[in-house]
């Protein structure tokens, strides 16, 4: 039987597989159900942004909660609460209630996100950390493919779709009980928590956090509204949902090679920084291609691929950078800030994208994306490697 770190890695990977398949089924399913109900793109975009708002709310308090109840209990709490919210989606079609349920689910999801990534970084051997974090990112990317694909297969009108989501979440929750007991962190009494701890992490890793913001903006923020983008271009509901799968496929393909490459850098910090610059430049190119989408709608497919590939790999590198530097509660703090900046990028993108798609999908929408990518590239280019 697997023991210690190996068992912990397997448990985190297994729970993540099932829970995120459920989550990535739920997100496009709810958006498409709102569209069928006649809800505007603006309101639907705000609903998508609620996901990131909940994550943004919980991350400042993650390290304090972990110190209070422990890492395993916190993970059980974060994995169990979404089960109740899906039961709520099954029982009501009230739009205000759906906003509340989505907020609760995203609070739990944010806590689980921080804990799972800190577990991976702590359980992974130092000489294999890049490939294991890359494998974890690949797993996440695969769930972004599988979840929307299952929605397209089951159909938005299927009475079994939400029940399938619930089954996936139950399976993921069960896997979390295999995580072994972990000793108290060495810095449990000395590390800062809450807002003070977050501020220390921001000061320690400002450029990494900016890269996390850009990754969140393109991979998850824009990814969450890809179905709306597809519908605005005249795609059917099934094809619009599959845009999410294309984005997820991009992150899946490149995460492990990026992690393996990062393990081989002679100067790891400098190598990661250089690769981040190239990835942000690629995102800028994809944003510029958005100006041609109204005339060439098929361009939306490679653009979605680049958003997922470059944005996801960018986040993988930031996660690896944090995991290579920190341990214990300090690692939870730094992971929380990384999740916070990634979430802030996703929240900004998803909340603005619906309005921009309603207003000017061919000009203002790509112009905003290009400005974000260009700003990120300029800061990364000018910043020294620490």
Q: For each predicted feature, which ranges?
A:
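Intracellular juxtamembrane helix-capping segments at the cytosolic ends
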Residues: 111-124, 312-326
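Helix-loop boundary and gating motifs at the non-cytosolic
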Residues: 2-52, 205-211, 219-233, 240
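Cytoplasmic helix-loop-helix junction between adjacent transmembrane helices
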Residues: 103-138
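Helix-to-loop junctions at the C-terminal end of transmembrane segments
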Residues: 58-70, 155, 254-270, 357
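A late C-terminal transmembrane helix in Major Facilitator Superfamily
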Residues: 329-358
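Structural signature of the two symmetry-related core transmembrane helices
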Residues: 73-87, 272-288, 370
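Symmetry-related core transmembrane helices of the 12-TM Major Facilitator Superfamily/SLC fold
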Residues: 162-177, 365-380
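C-terminal transmembrane helical hairpin of 12-TM major facilitator-type secondary transporters
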Residues: 270-315
């Amino acid at each position: 039987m697997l023991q210690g770190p190996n068992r912990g890695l397997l448990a985190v990977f297994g729970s993540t597989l099932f829970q995120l398949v459920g989550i990535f089924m739920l997100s496009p399913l709810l958006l498409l159900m709102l569209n069928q109900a006649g809800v505007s793109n603006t309101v639907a975009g705000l609903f998508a942004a609620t996901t990131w708002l909940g994550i943004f709310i919980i991350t400042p308090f993650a390290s304090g909660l972990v110190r209070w109840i422990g890492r395993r209990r916190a993970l059980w709490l974060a994995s169990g609460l979404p089960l109740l919210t899906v039961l709520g989606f099954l029982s009501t079609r009230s739009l205000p209630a759906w906003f509340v349920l989505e907020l609760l689910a995203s609070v739990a999801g944010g806590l689980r996100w921080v804990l799972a990534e800190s577990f991976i970084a702590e359980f992974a051997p130092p000489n294999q950390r890049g490939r294991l974090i890359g494998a974890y990112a690949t797993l996440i990317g695969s769930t972004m493919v599988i979840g929307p694909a299952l929605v397209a297969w089951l159909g938005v009108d299927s009475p079994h779709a939400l029940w399938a989501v619930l089954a996936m979440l139950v399976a993921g929750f069960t896997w979390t009980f295999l995580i072994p007991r972990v000793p108290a962190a060495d810095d449990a009494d000395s590390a800062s928590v809450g807002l003070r701890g977050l501020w220390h992490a921001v000061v320690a890793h400002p450029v990494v956090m900016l890269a996390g913001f850009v990754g969140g903006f393109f991979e998850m923020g824009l990814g969450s509204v890809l179905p709306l983008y597809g519908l605005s271009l005249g795609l059917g509901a099934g094809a619009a949902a599959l845009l999410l799968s294309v984005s997820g496929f991009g992150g899946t393909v490149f995460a492990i090679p990026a992690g393996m490459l990062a393990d081989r850098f002679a100067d790891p910090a400098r190598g990661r920084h250089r690769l981040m610059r190239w990835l942000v430049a690629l995102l800028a190119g994809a944003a510029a291609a958005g100006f041609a989408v109204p005339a060439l709608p098929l361009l939306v497919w490679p653009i979605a691929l680049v958003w997922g590939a470059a944005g996801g790999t960018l986040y993988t590198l930031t996660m690896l950078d944090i995991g290579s530097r920190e341990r214990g509660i300090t690692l939870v703090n730094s992971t929380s800030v990384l999740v916070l900046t990634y979430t802030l990028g996703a929240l900004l993108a998803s909340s603005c994208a619906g309005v921009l798609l309603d207003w000017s999908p061919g000009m203002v929408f790509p112009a905003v994306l290009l400005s974000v990518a260009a700003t990120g590239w300029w800061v990364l280019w000018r910043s020294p490697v620490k």
